[in-house]
Curated annotation (Swiss-Prot):
Gene3D superfamilies: SLED domain (3.90.1150.190), Transcription Factor, Ets-1 (1.10.150.50). Transmembrane segments: none annotated. The lineage of its organism: Eukaryota, Metazoa, Chordata, Craniata, Vertebrata. This is Sex comb on midleg-like protein 4. SUPFAM superfamilies: SAM/Pointed domain. The gene is Scml4. Residues 340-406 form the SAM domain.
Length: 408
C-alpha cells in the first residue's frame, strides 16, 4: 500500500524557518519599516548530558582591594647607634706599625752603616704597604742586593705590591704576597730575617733603648774575624764538654773510635787547657786541671772504667797534635759561611757527614759552590743539579740549616 504524497514538498528535514518567517523576509524590501515583524533567532543546541555548570568565583573585597604595605614602626624613640643601624657604621682600616732594631746583629748579608740610616719606625700604614717598606729596606741595606732579592717569596693573586732591586745592569721587580693582618706581616719578616741570619730585626713593639747596645754590637762585628781564627780557652772547654756528652760515654763503652777530625781537634784541646801535654813519655795520662784547682767533671774519666789506661783510649789520646798548618787546612778559614771559599765548603761537607756526603765533595768543587751559594741550596736543587739522592740531600740541608742558625 502506498502512502499519498503531499504535492510540492520534498522528502527530508523540514525547513529551519517557518512559513511566517519566510513571508516576513520576503516582504522585507517591499513593506515599510514599521510593518516588519521582529526576527526570531533559532535556539542553540542544548548542552551535552552530564555537563556541570561551574559556579562563578566570587571575588572577596580583600582580594579586590589594592595591596597595602605593612606600617613601619616608629623609630624616633629608639637611639640611633651602631647596634640599631649597622649600615651607617664606617669600617676602620687596619694599620700596622713596625719598629727597626738598629742594635741587632745584621748578619753577613746586610750592612750596618746603611741600617743606621733607616727610620726608627715604619708606618702606621696598611699591612701591604708596611711589608713592602720593610722588605725594600732589607734589599737597600744589603751588601749584594741580588742575594737578598732571591730570598724574597714571590706573591700571586689579589692586591699585589712589589719591591725592586738593581743588579746586572737591570731593574728587577718582584711581587709580594697578599697580606691582611699584623700576624702575617710578622711571620713573613721572621722567615726572611732567619734566611738573612739577622734575627730580632723587626717588631711590632718598640725596642728598649740601651746606651751601650750600639757599642757592644759594633764590638761583636769587629771581633768576629779574630774570634774565628783563634778560639778562646772557654770555647774549647765548652766544646770539649759537649763532645764528651755525645761521643765519650766511657761507662757504657769499652773503647772509643774517633772518626771525625773535629773530635780529634777537641781532644787535643783538652791537653792545652790543662797547661801541659796530654800524656807523658811513659804513656800514662794526666787529668787536665783548670786554673781554679778543681778538675772538670766533663773531662774526668770515672774510676770504674775497665779500660782507663787501656791501649784503645791511650792510642787515640796520645796521638801527636797536628801542626798549625795542618789545622788550618782542616777547618774553614772563617766561621762566617758567607766568606767561605769553595775549598772551605768542601771541608765543611766532608766533616759534616763523611760517610753520606764524603763521596760527593768533588761535586761542590766542580760546580764552584762557595759559602754564599751553600746557604742558598735547597733539597730540590741538590737533587737536580748535583745528582744526590733524597737521603744525602736531606742530610746536607739539615747541616746547612744548623749553620744558618749558628751565631758567628
Amino acid at each position: 500500500m502506498q502512502t499519498q504524497r503531499v504535492p510540492g514538498r520534498k522528502r527530508g528535514r523540514p525547513p529551519l524557518h517557518s512559513t511566517r518567517v519566510q513571508m516576513a523576509v520576503h516582504n522585507l524590501y517591499s513593506a515599510s519599516a514599521a510593518s516588519v515583524p521582529a526576527v526570531t533567532i533559532p535556539k542553540k543546541r542544548g548542552r551535552k548530558p552530564r555537563y556541570k555548570i561551574k559556579s562563578p568565583v566570587l571575588m572577596t573585597p580583600l582580594a579586590l582591594s589594592p595591596p597595602r604595605s605593612t606600617p613601619e614602626p616608629d623609630l624616633s624613640s629608639i637611639p640611633q647607634d651602631a647596634a640599631t643601624i649597622p649600615s651607617l657604621v664606617v669600617p676602620e682600616a687596619l694599620t700596622v706599625c713596625l719598629y727597626i732594631n738598629k742594635q741587632a746583629d745584621v748578619g753577613p748579608y746586610l750592612e750596618r752603616r746603611k741600617l743606621q740610616q733607616l727610620p726608627e719606625r715604619l708606618g702606621p700604614e696598611r699591612p701591604a704597604t708596611v711589608l713592602q717598606q720593610a722588605v725594600q729596606a732589607c734589599i737597600d741595606c744589603a751588601h749584594q742586593p741580588r742575594l737578598v732579592f732571591s730570598l724574597v717569596k714571590q706573591g700571586y693573586r689579589g692586591e699585589l705590591v712589589s719591591v725592586s732591586a738593581s743588579f746586572d745592569g737591570k731593574q728587577h721587580l718582584r711581587s709580594l704576597p697578599v697580606v691582611n693582618s699584623v700576624g702575617y706581616v710578622l711571620r713573613f719578616l721572621t722567615k726572611l730575617c732567619r734566611s738573612l741570619l739577622c734575627d730580632n730585626l723587626f717588631s711590632h713593639l718598640p725596642f728598649p733603648g740601651s746606651i751601650g747596645a750600639s757599642d757592644k754590637a759594633q764590638e761583636r762585628e769587629d771581633g768576629r774575624t779574630e774570634s774565628a781564627k783563634v778560639a778562646t780557652a772557654e770555647e774549647c772547654l765548652a766544646n770539649a764538654v759537649g763532645m764528651n756528652r755525645y761521643a765519650m760515654d766511657f761507662s757504657h763503652r769499652g773503647s772509643v773510635t774517633h772518626s771525625s777530625s773535629l773530635y780529634k781537634r777537641l781532644t787535643c784541646g783538652d791537653s792545652h787547657l790543662a797547661g801541659g801535654p796530654a800524656t807523658t813519655t811513659s804513656g800514662s795520662r794526666t787529668n787536665p786541671v783548670p786554673s781554679g784547682g778543681s778538675s772538670s767533671p766533663g773531662l774526668r774519666l770515672p774510676a770504674s772504667s775497665p779500660k782507663r789506661n787501656g791501649t784503645a783510649i791511650e792510642g787515640n789520646r796520645c796521638a801527636p797534635s797536628p801542626s798549625p798548618e795542618v789545622q788550618d787546612t782542616r777547618r774553614p778559614s772563617s766561621r762566617n759561611p758567607s766568606t767561605w771559599t769553595v775549598e772551605d765548603v768542601v771541608r765543611f761537607v766532608k766533616d759534616a757527614d763523611p760517610e753520606a756526603l764524603g763521596p760527593h765533595v768533588e761535586l761542590f768543587r766542580k760546580h764552584e759552590i762557595d759559602g754564599n751559594a751553600l746557604l742558598l741550596l735547597r733539597s730540590d736543587m741538590i737533587m737536580k743539579y748535583l745528582g744526590l739522592k733524597l737521603g744525602p740531600a736531606l742530610k746536607l740541608c739539615y747541616h746547612i740549616d744548623k749553620l744558618k742558625q749558628a751565631k758567628f
